A protein has these predicted regions:
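Conserved beta-strand hairpin/beta-sheet module of binuclear metal-dependent hydrolase folds
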Residues: 7-61, 133-143, 149
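Histidine-centered catalytic micro-motifs
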Residues: 68-78, 122-130, 183-189
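Core dinuclear metal-dependent hydrolase active-site scaffold
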Residues: 33, 111-136, 175
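Metallo-beta-lactamase
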Residues: 129-231
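Active-site HxH/HxHxD metal-binding segment of metal-dependent hydrolases
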Residues: 28, 39-42, 47-120, 205-209
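Hydrophobic residues at beta-strand termini and immediately following loops
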Residues: 22, 106, 124, 200
Length: 235
């Protein structure tokens, strides 16, 4: 079923939940489908440009898309959210400071009930002003705040971004239990599927940005990231 640009890179299921990680092309974008097994209700996180494919993929698995969750308003994450809403009748949710047409606002700490299972939104600004992360059971979908071994961009190329806010947001999610699974918005580890997810503990031990001991060290690393990557063989 999946074309080269539409690949299921993770499919976890137990008696309570199902969780799918999908690579949907674009800039190695990840999309997620969170499922309450009991009700068959599903939430799609960051549909990107693949509304039709996602709708068909859910239908083939007997799932009903009941909500569409947006981490932030950049087009590679949100372009066809409205179309997916039209196809499924599901509402779109995003942060208050994001420009996502037709979306309902989620606030920090707000919970949505997906059948019998909650999804919690965390306001994590930095890469964008209204950026949200979503926690489903022990799975944290971090959008473009935190990647495997890297963090989201800030600066002139990202309007509304703020390094100080990103630093605070990273410190906040780093306080979650170390076994919390991290599912990023892009496959920037290597682009080859070798590490499509991580844990909070792994990132705290290995991510050079989370190893920074101060905001000043964090900004210095950001400013010198290209040379750091060359020195350490990071792609």
């Amino acid at each position: 079923m999946a074309a080269k640009s539409q690949i299921v890179t993770g499919d976890y299921a137990d008696e309570y939940i199902r969780f799918l990680q999908l690579q949907l092309g674009g800039d190695r974008n990840f999309c997620y489908i969170c499922v309450d097994v009991k009700s068959g209700m599903a939430a799609v996180v960051d549909p990107g440009f693949r509304a039709g494919w996602l709708s068909a993929a859910a239908a083939e698995r007997g799932l009903k898309i009941s909500c569409i969750l947006i981490t932030h308003g950049h087009s590679d994450h949100v372009a066809q959210a409205g179309r997916l809403a039209d196809i499924t009748g599901a509402p779109v949710y995003a942060g208050e400071r994001e420009r996502v047409p037709g979306s309902l606002v989620l606030t920090d700490g707000q919970r949505l009930n997906l059948g019998t299972r909650p999804i919690t939104a965390f306001h994590t600004p930095g890469h964008s002003p209204g950026h949200l992360c979503y926690l489903f059971e022990n799975r944290l979908m971090t959008g473009d705040l935190l990647f495997c071994g890297k963090v989201g961009g800030t600066g002139p190329g990202f309007p509304g971004s703020a390094e100080e806010e990103e630093w605070a947001s990273l410190k906040r999610i780093a306080s979650l239990p170390e076994e919390t699974l991290v599912y990023p918005g892009h496959d920037y580890y290597g682009g080859d599927g070798r590490m499509p997810h991580s844990t909070i503990g792994c990132e705290k031990r290995n991510n050079p940005f989370l190893l920074c001991g101060s905001f000043e060290a964090f900004t210095h690393l950001k400013q010198n990231w290209d040379s750091y990557k060359r020195e350490h063989g990071i792609r």
